[in-house]
Amino acid sequence: MAYQDEESKEYSEKVVKIDRVAKVVKGGRRFSFNALSVVGDQKGKVGIGFGKANEVPDAIRKSIEAAKKHLVKINFKGHTIPHEVVGKFKSARVILKPSTAGTGIIAGASVRSIVEKAGIQDVLTKSWGSSNPVNIVKATLDALEQLETPILAAKKRGISLNQLFGKD
């Protein structure tokens, strides 16, 4: 039990969306709930999870457990992201742009939740296409997964850092 307590302190959680859905059966409607959660350590690890259950607390618990199982490491240093990036999921599009220190997180609620949990402090964002929070969160995660540090970008291209920044 102690291991689980340590793990829960390590990550902060945010419920992005709770939805009530209905299944129509012969006797009427059968209601259940689903929840979308974001979990992160605010040091570069973030995950999203989706849970479904007949009661809200169970759906939230399941979504948080799913998010902890699907953590992703985000490449960024300091207070902002290293470069502009566009994330896509279905019809949702999210653009993330680096910004100067002190700007804060300029984002909608769905994008803000995942960016905050990743530990990014200053970023400009714009989302368009789908307004469904599930699609927006997944598009944001797609964008964050595309981030790469300058050292990694130079290594991928087989050039030096000076060449990458046009100093050679």
From Swiss-Prot:
Coiled coil: none annotated. One of its GO terms (molecular function) is rRNA binding. InterPro entries: Ribosomal_Su5_D2-typ_SF, Ribosomal_uS5, Ribosomal_uS5_bac-type, Ribosomal_uS5_C, Ribosomal_uS5_N, Ribosomal_uS5_N_CS, Ribsml_uS5_D2-typ_fold_subgr. The keyword Ribosomal protein applies. It comes from the Bacteria. Residues 11-74 form the S5 DRBM domain. Keywords: Ribonucleoprotein, Ribosomal protein, RNA-binding, rRNA-binding. One of its GO terms (cellular component) is small ribosomal subunit. GO terms for biological process: translation. Belongs to the universal ribosomal protein uS5 family. The N-terminal domain interacts with the head of the 30S subunit; the C-terminal domain interacts with the body and contacts protein S4. The interaction surface between S4 and S5 is involved in control of translational fidelity. Part of the 30S ribosomal subunit. Contacts proteins S4 and S8. NCBIfam families: rpsE_bact. With S4 and S12 plays an important role in translational accuracy. Located at the back of the 30S subunit body where it stabilizes the conformation of the head with respect to the body. HAMAP family: Ribosomal_uS5_B. PANTHER family: MITOCHONDRIAL RIBOSOMAL PROTEIN S5 (PTHR48277:SF1). This is Small ribosomal subunit protein uS5. It comes from Leptospira borgpetersenii serovar Hardjo-bovis (strain JB197).
